[in-house]
């Protein structure tokens, strides 16, 4: 297919999605929830087909020499699929984010202003692997009244085709037009999708640093996403050793390919001699490769030396860098210099240290005495997430339903005109909030 043909075809797909989304935006909460329930049921019915498609994807990816972290994201086992379907049902239980009155203000008798939440329109979601991400995104899009055009990586094509086939079958039994969900599978379509600013309202890329930056640099459509997942745990001088070990191990090994897994462990010098041998043993038992700065090597001489590049590397694997710092201030400075503004944690029993850490670490998530792996839309109670945003502007952190809506101003009058409120005898506004 030529570039011109791809553009023409995708233009038609985008128009269909937008038309379907405009109808979805007008549906009742009950109708949307029925559609979400039908999607969950259809996914359950197609479970074997989806899992077999994923096995085929994994076999093909292995033959092509896929990187280990990406392979872990690609794998969709029965447990992951079950959790994803449960997440769909959880989204159905969430409050409808559409039609919420944010402002209701009388400007004058009979002249009322409202600010009401409404869908964004059409979402373009581009992701490299993680087929279960498609399931999460589709459920959130339906609940928030948005159409969605999915572009999966070549390694996950079979899995995503099976998922979208099931979703469309489920939607065909409801009031939601199946055209509200579309799937693209080629690189050429990715480039054309990024040019569809007439039809697509938001692009959400999920993938590697280089991938997200490519998207950001090649579209005029607003982009929501993060380019790195360099997270830290700082072990303060007042840390409880057992808590520190448990959190450090969980934050690294529970799922090292996740963007909220830690890549660097910062340790206060006064606790390092006691803490480091214990945590090193616990991590070694989980096959984690350790790298340390010069001071760490004095305590753990058997580990590899860390270099400057390690502080800015997202390993997404069983590798962890360790640095000893002299103070909380130094730890915060390191995080703000090398971190990705994703999620960072402090382990301490000192309340003042927590307040300082929370106030000065410029990340979307700042945690105390708990694992960075909690930075997740499902664990936050959002039902699911479309992605993580590390931007300074909202939405920030795990983005659920509230990040997929915008608002419009509605004003109702009885023939009111602006001239009444201007000039020498201007009538004053009442500006009374309901």
Curated annotation (Swiss-Prot):
Instruction: Give the EC number.
Output: 1.2.1.41
GO BP, sorted A to Z: L-proline biosynthetic process
Please name the pathway.
Amino-acid biosynthesis; L-proline biosynthesis; L-glutamate 5-semialdehyde from L-glutamate: step 2/2
Any one GO cellular component localisation term in the record: cytoplasm
Give the primary localization class.
cytoplasm
User: Keywords assigned by UniProt?
Assistant: Amino-acid biosynthesis, Cytoplasm, NADP, Oxidoreductase, Proline biosynthesis
Enzyme class, one word?
oxidoreductase
NADP among keywords: yes
- List the catalytic activities from the record: L-glutamate 5-semialdehyde + phosphate + NADP(+) = L-glutamyl 5-phosphate + NADPH + H(+)
Q: Which GO terms describe its molecular function?
A: glutamate-5-semialdehyde dehydrogenase activity; NADP binding
What InterPro entries has UniProt attached to this entry? Ald_DH/histidinol_DH (IPR016161), Ald_DH_C (IPR016163), Ald_DH_N (IPR016162), Aldehyde_DH_dom (IPR015590), G-glutamylP_reductase_CS (IPR020593), Glu-5-SA_DH (IPR012134), GPR_dom (IPR000965)
Please provide an example of a Pfam family that matches this protein in its UniProt record.
Aldedh
- Localization terms from the record: Cytoplasm
Protein family per UniProt: Belongs to the gamma-glutamyl phosphate reductase family.
Q: What does this protein do?
A: Catalyzes the NADPH-dependent reduction of L-glutamate 5-phosphate into L-glutamate 5-semialdehyde and phosphate. The product spontaneously undergoes cyclization to form 1-pyrroline-5-carboxylate.
Q: Could you tell me which PANTHER family the record lists for this protein?
A: DELTA-1-PYRROLINE-5-CARBOXYLATE SYNTHASE (PTHR11063:SF8), GLUTAMATE SEMIALDEHYDE DEHYDROGENASE (PTHR11063)
Name the chain's protein: Gamma-glutamyl phosphate reductase
**Gene (UniProt):** proA
């Amino acid at each position: 297919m030529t570039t011109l043909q791809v553009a023409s075809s995708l233009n038609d797909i985008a128009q269909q999605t937008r038309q379907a989304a405009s109808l979805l935006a007008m549906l009742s909460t009950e109708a949307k929830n029925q559609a979400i329930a039908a999607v969950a049921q259809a996914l359950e019915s197609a479970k074997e087909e989806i899992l077999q498609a994923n096995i085929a994807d994994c076999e093909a990816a292995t033959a092509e020499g896929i990187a280990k972290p990406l392979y872990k994201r690609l794998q969709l086992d029965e447990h992951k699929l079950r959790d994803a379907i449960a997440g769909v049902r959880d989204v159905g239980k969430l409050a409808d984010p559409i039609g919420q009155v944010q402002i209701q203000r009388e400007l004058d008798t009979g002249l009322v202003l409202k600010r009401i939440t409404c869908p964004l329109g059409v979402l373009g979601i581009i992701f490299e692997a993680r087929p279960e991400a498609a399931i999460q995104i589709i459920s959130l899009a339906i609940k928030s009244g948005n159409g969605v055009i999915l572009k999966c990586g070549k390694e996950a094509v079979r899995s995503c085709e099976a998922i979208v086939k099931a979703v469309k079958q489920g939607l065909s039994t409801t009031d939601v037009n199946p055209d509200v969900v579309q799937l693209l599978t080629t690189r050429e379509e990715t480039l054309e999708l990024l040019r569809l600013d007439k039809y697509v309202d938001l692009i959400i890329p999920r993938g590697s640093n280089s991938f997200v930056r490519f998207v950001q640099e090649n579209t005029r459509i607003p982009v929501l996403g993060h380019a790195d997942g360099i997270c830290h745990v700082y072990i303060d001088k007042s840390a409880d050793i057992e808590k520190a070990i448990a959190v450090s191990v969980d934050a690294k090994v529970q799922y090292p390919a996740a963007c909220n897994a830690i890549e660097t462990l910062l340790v206060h010098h006064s606790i390092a001699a006691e803490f480091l041998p214990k945590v090193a043993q616990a991590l070694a038992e989980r096959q984690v490769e350790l790298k340390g700065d010069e001071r760490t090597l004095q305590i753990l001489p058997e580990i590899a030396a860390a270099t400057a590049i390690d502080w800015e590397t997202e390993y997404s694997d069983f590798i962890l860098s360790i640095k000893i710092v002299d103070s909380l201030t130094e730890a915060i400075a390191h995080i703000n210099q090398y971190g990705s503004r994703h999620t960072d944690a402090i382990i301490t029993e000192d309340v003042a240290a927590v307040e300082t850490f929370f106030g000065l670490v410029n990340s979307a998530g700042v945690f105390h005495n708990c694992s960075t792996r909690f930075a997740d839309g499902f664990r936050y109670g959002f039902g699911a997430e479309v992605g993580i945003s590390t931007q300074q502007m909202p939405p920030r952190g795990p983005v659920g339903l509230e990040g997929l809506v915008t608002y419009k101003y509605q004003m109702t009058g009885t023939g009111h005109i602006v001239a009444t409120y201007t000039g020498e005898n201007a009538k004053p506004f009442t500006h009374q909030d309901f």
